[in-house]
Amino acid sequence: MRWNILLATAALAAWVAVAEDDFGEHRKLAYNRNDLVCDAGWGLWAVPLPMDYDGDGDLDLLVSSAGMPSPGLAWFENDGSGILRPARIIDRRQRRNVTVSYVANHVIVCEPGIAYRDFQQNGFSRPEPIPLPPPEHYDRDCQYRFADVDGDGRTDVIIGYSDWREYGWDDAYDPSGRWTGGPLHGYVGWARNEGTNEKPRYAPFQQFQTSKGPVDVYGTPSPNMVDWDRDGDTDLLCGSFLDSLTWFENIGPDPAAPVFAPGRPVEVDGQPLRLELEMLQVVAVDWDRDGDTDLVIGQEDGRVVLVENAGHDAGTLPRLKPPVFFRQRADKVKCGALATPDIVDWDGDGDMDLVSGNTAGFLEWIENLGGNPPRWETPVRLTAGGTVIRFQAGPNLSIQGPAEAKWGYTIPTVADWDGDGLPDILCNTIVGKIVWFRNMGTRQHPELAPAEPVHVAWPDEPPRPHWNWWNPEPGDLVVEWRTKLAVIDLNKDGLMDLVAVDHEGFLAWYERLGPEQRYALAPGRRIFHVADPETMGVRDGGGRPLSIDINGDGVNDLQQRSPSGDPLFLCSDRGRDRTVVRDARTIYLPENPVPFLSPPASEQSLLRANGGWAGRSGRRTLVMTDWDRDGRLDLIMNGVNVNLWRGTGEDGRQVFRDEGPMSDLVLSGHSTCPAVGDLDGDGVDELLIGAEDGFLYWFPPGTLKPETVKP
């Protein structure tokens, strides 16, 4: 087998080299060190496919990612050292719902309705149809696997699938913060093989049942058939969209009609196993070849954990060890998923480091060790008041519902906020409430105090996004979620101001007040304009132009006002699966058109970074800097990679023209995050882009489109 793999690898080598360039591999920030080990990670939404890919007798780790900008399948070779080799890309297609099965010591890889029975030899080149359609009403997850469910020696098909219809997606809290949508559902069932293994004939698909109803977990079931309690029959073990695993004991007297006990949590040391992140993809396999079943689990940020089985006796549950992340020889710098870097000399040693957030809600410091190209340390999680910083939405602080409980979406901006000469951190999150961490240490040894709110001198109650069910405390600044702040002395008075996407999606300036107001911020002022309102005025979370004309008057509704004079938002009409517009109180439908109002002339060219409602809101990240050195501030904002918004205003007016993407690479999934600074110490600022795959893409000026470098 090894010879076959070598031949296949050689045949792919030239293609892979081209594919890597196409997907930005050459722009990923590298550790540039041979002595370093880090967590093994690949892309977004890790789906592990453990198998002996190179035929050397041990299991390698293959990881599939369907997320942008690093889709495809990566091979982490296990050379027996306990540390995996760096990822090698062996497929570049965006494959959702890929799985692995182990049948009679044979590896079969599946996609919905497709089997690759000789994957180790031929990869995805020889698909075979599985004559079994997917279940109706599945969303996101539809996972085919093979197993002998009934013990008759014939291989059956099991399918796990998610159903999001009851959950919906966003904006479903009542005024007390209770989610009024339903839960996610993750169902599992099987199609019995009534033919032979050579010529299978599958019975109609049937859901697995427990003594209390259908097998149902919280989305993303990733089902595994395994004798978990070693009592001689096949049990069912599942993952979930959140952070837990569930097993269902087989209690049916008739193997041809399996019935399971209600689900019980998989436990470690007597407590339910909880993973660090969510969107779990579970594979039950004997990773260490010691004769028992271990668990290999992928999570949203592209990393994979091993939950080792320490052994168990017949009729007992496994003694599981705590989860441990697979490790690899360090190659490319990765910071979770949706990396949101900022560039700063954090430790005062003269070179520029990185402070980044991610979906998991951590803040991480990536130290620059110097050199050109720079060498890097692995990310270190920052602490405040002696505790690791982590924001999480919990059951009701994500507008998209409780399925996002373990996400935090931290987006830091590092600046000297209190004027003491030390870099502090301001931070937005999944919640949208702006906080800051005071640096109480020294220039060489930063030490952060616990988070405290940024204070605004509001004359009345603080505004908030209209879809938030909760109200800010007096003085709080609550803006749209998942947006990056700019901290800059905009009016040149010696005090650091704040620029943010406000609670209605407009870019706003929050001026810093003097000592008589205890250096609070003034309420936001919408002073930022676009050079061409018709083409540049309103965007969505990915930076794309956003327009809708629900009343047919030929004008973009999102640049108008409702009859009551309020801004309008793009939103979903769930009942009819369409987009419409609304203000804070009223949804406007095309079958009942009403005239909208034109805003005052001074507001018609305002830069509205996002015109979306609720889950469509926010997600805009930006840097404000004089990129082209013409004496005017420019904006760099997220887009297909990032866009340069060149400052064109005169006499101090803040006017910007969208020059388009700064690179030809497609880096966006939901959004990207820009940072600007001199990482290699050559005296020239470079562009760094954090992407949804968690990798950081580094662009010295010579690698960018010329028209986005010079005016």
Located regions from the model:
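Sec-dependent signal peptide recognition
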Residues: 2-8
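Beta-propeller-forming repeat regions
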Residues: 15-711
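Short, linear, compositionally biased motifs with a strong N-terminal bias
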Residues: 10-12
